Amino acid sequence: MVILSNGHQWKYSEFLDNKDYSFDKDQILKSISKDEIDDAYNSISKWEGYAPTPLILLNKLSNELSLKNIFYKDEDKRFDLKSFKALGGAYAVEKVTKGDKDIVVATATAGNHGRSVAWGARRLGLKCKIFISEFVSKARGQAMADLGADVIKVKGNYEKSLLECIKQSTDNNWQIVQDVAWKDYMLVPKYTMAGYSVMMREIVDQINNEKITHIILQAGVGGMAGAMIAGIARYLDNIPITIVVEPDSAACVLESIRTGKVEKIDIKRESLMGGMSCGEVSLVPWEILKHSVKHCISLPDDDIGNTMKLLGNSSFSDQKIIAGENSAPGVISLIASCEDQNIKKKLQLDKKKKVINVGSERDTDKKKKKKLISQ
């Protein structure tokens, strides 16, 4: 391997097969219906500034790993937010407010979901309250404030910020627009996921009837992964091998699939993959993920900065790709899997295979990126 031949070993922490795997399209579409998926695409595709984000061929990496094609869905180009999250929170704001300008929307976020809600609120002329944990960088908080949101920092982690959001929203009669589901709060996260599924519609249009064999999906609370799998059930004729990747410090989907029930992770160390550092899978995506994810992979933070650098200097493709830390895990897990011959064989990765990765965001925190790629 030319690019990867410097003796560096690409690492994964754990690889898990889903013993309960059964990809049932009809069952998946009971969680998010065809109509909900179609409504999201029909609405979002009419928004000002909408355009499908690029599907970039990582031709150099494909050759290195002896795969037919590796594609990278580049969400750096998504509206002004430069993240797939623009599809979810903003669409949910539109759905729940129904043109009522007096509604105040609120959410808790690790960054990009809050930016989407703030952007969606500004787009509709609404007031917006954003709750962030103390671990969210100053740059990410400022990005939401720049969109007109009132940003409230909460001591503790993401879960603490969510609890404070729920408390203050209940006290003040604000409308919570969250991407996390819990008992009696399912509809808004479904709207958010329906928005995310637009990516899968675009991919289907972009691959020109090529058969995708594998798709690697990042998971925090599982919303994007569940949405993309719902999109597969809606739009694809074949069923690709579905792989979820998470930080090893917050592998809540992996642990839940291991036991067959929702498991809460006590996060001892915050991952560099901040938007994925979540301790509990959301209920709506869990109903999809528990049977339709074939394999789970957890990763350490070791290769995040290097992967961002290699994407950015055209090592993996003919294009320079501006990637954030949450865009790197899919590529890392694919390289690490190909370097482990047992895993490569189990995943059936060979010269005929075509793999989708989701480049979920650009470098929304440039100071953090500079530090990462210099290490």
Predicted regions and their residues:
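PLP-dependent amino-acid enzyme catalytic core
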Residues: 1-375
